[in-house]
Regions:
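Beta-strand-turn-beta hairpins that frame and shape the catalytic cleft
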Residues: 1-6, 117-125, 174-178, 205-209
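N-terminal active-site segment of His-dependent metallophosphoesterases
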Residues: 1-58
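Active-site neighborhood of phospho(di)ester-bond hydrolases with catalytic His/Asp-centered motifs
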Residues: 8-9, 33-38, 59-64, 127, ...
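Active-site environment of divalent metal-dependent phosphoester hydrolases
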Residues: 12-17, 41-44, 65-70, 159-173, ...
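Glycine-rich phosphate-binding loop signature in dinucleotide/nucleotide-binding domains
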Residues: 25-30, 119-120, 153-156, 200, ...
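Active-site neighborhood of divalent metal-dependent phosphoester bond hydrolases
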Residues: 49, 56-117, 138, 142-156
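Anionic-ligand binding region
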Residues: 145-185, 196
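Acidic, His/Gly-rich catalytic cores of divalent-metal-dependent hydrolytic chemistry
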Residues: 172-265
Length: 265
């Protein structure tokens, strides 16, 4: 009997995309649904996203944003190294921090950093950045098969699910293990499209199938909300165009070029 798992990450306060994703998942009715963390950042009114997730009782991991907000830290702990990336990240963090109530902080503080499942005999590890570090970026172009295999063996899993980079990808390893970056639903995937993506995995007795589902939502309504909240115009432009305008210095060249090629193709 097949078992399906839906997973998404990087909500980034995009409550309209979250609502659309949850509706799509609800129609498909997988046996398991997980959010891999990062409630806030980038978008408007983070409490709206918190209310949606808590009302559904959806299991969620603690991302770097959730840890920082929950524990009253001064920045998002995103792991950026470029000053421009960090400057925009700080604007986003300060807004989120100022618009989250104590009940939500307590909830975020209590979230687990990782989770383990066994689905049709496959050991599944869910985390935010990587099993090693909550804010580690696992980029497709920078992760060799050997490294990903080591990561799975070292952390005792057959299927590894992560997020944090904002770009979705899947690697089927020669040994039969799988690594899946589920991407983010809080902003588009830097491909000139305004939809967002989540991952759906199907576990059969002898195989694992991995797919990504695009979800449309009212991105223009979100852009107007962001403008009303006086969030940076650069953030709003990303929602309206499907192209990232901030935190790009952290993205490897191959990811930038591949996304450009997909949009042009």
């Amino acid at each position: 009997m097949s078992i399906r798992l839906a997973a998404f990450g990087g909500v980034y306060s995009n409550h309209l995309a979250l609502d659309a994703v949850l509706e799509d998942i609800g129609q498909r009715a997988p046996e398991h649904t997980w959010c891999l963390g990062d409630l806030g950042g980038f978008g408007p009114s983070p409490e709206k996203s918190a209310a949606l997730l808590r009302a559904r009782g959806l299991p969620m991991l603690q991302g770097n944003y959730d840890h920082s907000i929950g524990h009253g830290l001064d920045d998002c702990g995103c792991g950026y190294t470029d000053p421009s990336d960090n400057a925009f990240a700080q604007v986003s963090f300060d807004y989120t921090n100022a618009n989250v109530g104590e009940a939500t902080r307590e909830w975020l503080r209590a979230l687990p950093p990782q989770a383990r499942l066994v689905l049709n005999g496959r050991r599944v590890l869910l985390c935010h950045g990587s099993p090693r570090q909550v804010n580690e970026f696992l980029w497709d172009s920078r992760c060799s098969d050997a490294f990903l295999e080591w990561l799975c063996v070292a952390h005792e899993c057959d299927v590894l699910l992560v997020t944090h980079t904002g770009l979705h990808w899947h690697r089927a390893l020669p040994t039969g293990k799988h690594v899946v970056n589920v991407g983010a639903i809080g902003r588009p995937a830097h491909d000139g499209r305004m939809n967002v993506w989540y991952a759906e995995l199907t576990f059969d007795a002898g195989r694992v199938a991995v797919g990504f589902r695009p979800v449309e939502y009212d991105h223009e309504a979100l852009a107007r909300e962001m403008e009303a909240e006086r969030l940076p115009a650069e953030f709003v432009e990303t929602i309206r165009t499907g192209w990232w305008t901030t935190c790009l210095e952290n993205v490897p060249v191959r990811e930038r070029m591949r996304q450009w090629g997909e949009a042009r193709g």
